[in-house]
Amino acid sequence: MQLPPSTASSETHLEYTSHFQGAGEAWKDAEIITTEQRAAIQEVSALVQARADALRARLSASEQAAEATSRARARFGVRDVVLDLRVMACSDGLLNGPAQRSRSHELYRSVMLGRTASEITETRPRQQPELVQRMRTQLADAPDFAAKAPLLADLDEALQKSFGARGALDDAEAAENQASDAEIAARLELRRTLEQAYGKLRAAFPGQRDFVESFFPRRKARRSGEEGEAEKKRNEG
């Protein structure tokens, strides 16, 4: 019996179960099979089918979770761009207002936390919302000027959406990890079931190794040219 490598994908494992089920269906229709043997084939086929169905469900859930994470990551990326724009707008509002075009102005340095706007926007996306939140607090405590209220409103909206998008991404990544773990567990359970099925078939059909082996696909042997190429790559590595 040959099972796929333990590191093989769920899709590869399911290909093995498709072969197993195809062989089972063919043997059940074979005229040389007795009623008792047909019942044994039916039993192991049902076991394998149940585990295969479970893995398919877990695989589907894992793929959906990965897609959800990708969408959540894209949304958070968009919110990072928007937050950057709000930071730049705040910097411009200060420079065109009370800071009088000077980044060395005390108010500018206070609101911008002693940084330039670019230094803030270049912060890692996951860390930036807290930094901008501190900046927003400094702006709120600053003396009033014409652009202060709209700048605060824009920062508040951008921060709220950035925090929300980051939280949604965290939730999506956690769900993806959970789905991936469940898929791996289902795949391992399917491998164990295939091994058990092999043992049950050997017990039900003693001395008929070829018959039992027909339920499992055989890995194709490499042609000599392929083997030579593989050896060449190993030597080059």
Residue map of PLM features:
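Basic/polar low-complexity intrinsically disordered segments
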Residues: 1-237
